[in-house]
């Protein structure tokens, strides 16, 4: 039924006389363990895509306290890593207005820092390189939310 080129993942329609017809899925691991809250460029929803963005859990793995980008074709990853006191929200991909490439845009993630004298902030990353472009620090605490969305201003 479906095979992804260069991947071990597949979806096959199976006929079974006892159970009827069903779809058998075979998954494939991409990247390192610990990747969570995956997001893609929404312009690629329902279409082939190459990059997925996510966060690392709070375990001791590779993605811990990170915002990550994984190339699903190669399995290679890039990350921005905070410190052990910072907790990051789900990343939100914001496409550049004149984007040509899939990863042409920025990643937004709120970062809550549990230390008393360290500010919470909105993190802005270059989606292609995962390098920090800037941050907007706030006075006070930013509620640690798991999910986020970017809504552009309507003109």
Predicted feature descriptions by range:
Residues 1-155:
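Beta-propeller domains
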């Amino acid at each position: 039924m479906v095979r992804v080129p260069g991947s071990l993942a597949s979806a096959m329609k199976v006929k079974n006389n006892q159970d009827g017809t069903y779809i058998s899925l075979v998954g494939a691991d991409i990247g390192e363990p610990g990747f969570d809250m995956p997001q893609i460029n929404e312009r690629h929803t329902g279409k082939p895509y190459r990059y997925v963005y996510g966060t690392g859990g709070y375990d001791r793995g590779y993605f811990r306290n990170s915002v990550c980008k994984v190339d699903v074709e190669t399995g290679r990853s890039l990350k921005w890593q905070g410190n052990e006191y910072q907790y990051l929200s789900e990343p939100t991909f914001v496409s550049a207005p004149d984007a040509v490439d899939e990863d042409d845009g920025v990643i937004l993630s709120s970062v809550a820092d549990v230390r008393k004298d360290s500010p919470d902030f909105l993190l802005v990353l270059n989606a292609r390189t995962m390098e920090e472009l800037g941050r907007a620090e706030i006075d006070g605490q930013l509620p640690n939310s798991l999910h986020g969305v970017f809504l552009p201003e309507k003109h």
